[in-house]
């Protein structure tokens, strides 16, 4: 891509997707492996002492060192790009050439709501990362509930908006992105309710192996959430986020105001 006179920085959008997908998935994988290798007995223990072979996400990422530091660093690093992408996706939807000709105020409100939910999801994720269940179980549980609710509503709303604004049919990759969004959202919602059931069943009946299944469902929920957000690769395929001066006189926009295609 050629730089204009007022362009300060240009970053291919695919690197943002690598960051928002690669950092949290790597953090989860590393922390689970380390907890199994270094703290197997502690990380897999349960309150009723039944057989369990996998740590829950909370046990794997927020209880022992060095796992909790790896998790906090990698999640913290990926939050910044997530915030930028949340606003960029909102502008992407509103800028669709195939958006409806009527109901502009309603559409803008829903796009703003989706963006707000996405930002709030990241806030709750950051709070979950900073406050472990062992430090403040009540607050940690509330943050998890907020994260899950915001995630589900955002996934469903943004997928609907992607179709409603015409982005699904605007490019050849739009249909693929839409299908992957539906897949990621469906798996996340399924994992949420299945995880709640397994958690209840474990605490009620204390059956061997149930908490292991719960942990697997937790991992699947996290990975499906990451997968959903990585569909942005298709939405912004071949594009760059450009930092540019407002008037060519040294006043700079801190958020992406121009998304150009590679030339």
From Swiss-Prot:
Domain of life of the native organism: Eukaryota
GO annotation, biological process: GPI anchor biosynthetic process
Matching InterPro entries: Frag1/DRAM/Sfk1 (IPR019402), PGAP2 (IPR039545)
GO cellular component: endoplasmic reticulum membrane; Golgi membrane
Broad class of the protein's primary localization: Golgi
Location in or out of the cell: Golgi apparatus membrane; Endoplasmic reticulum membrane
Transmembrane helix in keyword set: yes
Residue intervals passing through the bilayer: 16-36, 69-89, 109-129, 143-163, 180-200, 208-228
Annotated keywords: Endoplasmic reticulum, Golgi apparatus, GPI-anchor biosynthesis, Membrane, Transmembrane, Transmembrane helix
Membrane topology summary: Multi-pass membrane protein
Family in the record: Belongs to the PGAP2 family.
PANTHER family per record: FGF RECEPTOR ACTIVATING PROTEIN 1, POST-GPI ATTACHMENT TO PROTEINS FACTOR 2
Function: Involved in the lipid remodeling steps of GPI-anchor maturation. Required for stable expression of GPI-anchored proteins at the cell surface.
Protein name: Post-GPI attachment to proteins factor 2
Annotated source species: Caenorhabditis elegans
